[in-house]
Amino acid sequence: MLGHVEDRDLWRFKLPGTREIQAVVFSHEYTFEMWDELMSADQIGLLKMTAAGAAIERKHHKDVAELVKVCQRRMVIGGHDVPVASLPYTLVSDAAHAMAQGEPFAACYWDTAEGRNFGLRATNEGLDVSDIAKQYGGGGHAKAAGFKVPRDHALAMC
């Protein structure tokens, strides 16, 4: 199980069933008891999770694709005209990754009472998004980073 968590966290998806297993994990409440139960899965348990997660994963990607299609627009972030979408933080990784294809990077944002949060994603061919995030006081990794701006910032008003 831990290998699948790492596989998704590092956005490698090299282990068979990672997306499906993680879909099952994400469908449960985040409690220590539930995590203990999920982490104790043996090989048969992982196979069952893979089967159960296939439909969840299919629905997730269908929803992400449809939302990106209707929500995507362009915005200048860090001097780069890139695709963006206003989506819940739970969809940021998959949605921004999809929009980043053929682009320097892509962003998803979600508003809170305090300001606007941005999640940036880039493909291997894209820019180092941690450098972009640092311009706004954020940080992260080369291909996944983020930052937050206050409600009166120009990026929060467009």
Spans of model-derived segments:
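Internal, active-site/partner-interface "lid" segment
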Residues: 1-48
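A short, terminal or domain-edge coil/loop segment
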Residues: 20-27, 55-62, 126
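Short N-terminal helix-initiation segments at or just after the protein's N-terminus
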Residues: 22-25, 47-56, 87-92
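Electropositive nucleic-acid-contacting surfaces
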Residues: 32-78
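Gly/His-enriched, cation/cofactor- and phosphate-binding structural elements
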Residues: 61-158
